[in-house]
Amino acid sequence: MFFDSRQAADWLPQRWSIQVEKHSADIGIFGGSGFYKFFDDCEEVSVETPYGPPSDKVFIGTLGGKKVAFLPRHGRHHQHPPHKINYRANVWAMKHLGVSRIISPCAAGSLQKHVAPGSFVVCDQFVDRTSGRIDTFYDGPISTHVSAADPYCGQLRQLAVKAGKDCGITMHEKGTVVVIQGPRFSSKAESKWFGAQGWEVINMTQYPEGHLSKELEMCVVNVALITDYDSGLHADVNPVSHAEVVEVFTKNLDKLQKMLIKLIEHIPAERNECQCARTLASARI
């Protein structure tokens, strides 16, 4: 199927009323390729956006008793490196399909000794160390200043922590993710400096993905699966490699999938316990 949402571009910076009844989904997941294989009644949907093509087709199916849209942020063949992902197109596609909650799992490195590989961190803050990424939908003519003080939905974070604990996973209930530009990994000096600031994890995709989702008044939660200690943490830690990240992530993928399914099962239909749906109420001049 194919949807043309280019004609809807003029809603910015106005309120939107985009509804796609036939293929609507309640929850969206940005993640690695392959997760859609666990869907019931999976269907591939093409979405054209005002910002160009998303990373891939969107997979829509049933998971945890709810309609879920899944988009592999790097593409199904991992062809889009983190600094080249069309984040605006990806987020727009989810909004266009009626998604109101975004779950954003990712692989991440640990910057602190107590955050061990194999554990999960439900981040509550980010630090943006990227450069040149387009990170807003609001380029005028109406000035719109969306707060990033609390970048992740408090209600979804609580539900994610509970879901992980119910699955027997070691969960860190909060943490700061420092987002680097990529595709290179950090130098030891950079990694050591990040850790000295007290930041817990390091990743390449959480910004601007999460903030753009918030700009469109969607709830967003990050679940970081820790794959390695970053290079500046221990003197005897070998520099991180992509192969190592993939190996550890794959070993823990079953835990992540079980946790996400349980999280989805417990997400309520109504958004009554957060302010995410009213993000723009105080953002405009």
What are these regions (language model features)?
Residues 2-4, 8-149:
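Metabolite-binding pocket within alpha/beta catalytic cores that recognizes anionic/polar moieties
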Residues 204-242:
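Zn-dependent metallopeptidase/amidohydrolase metal-coordination segment
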Residues 100-101, 200, 219:
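Short acidic/polar active-site loop segments enriched in Thr and Asp
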Residues 95-98, 195, 214:
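Non-catalytic positions within long, well-ordered alpha-helices that form the structural scaffold/packing
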Residues 231-283:
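His/Asp/Glu-rich mid-to-C-terminal helical/loop segments that flank catalytic regions of hydrolases
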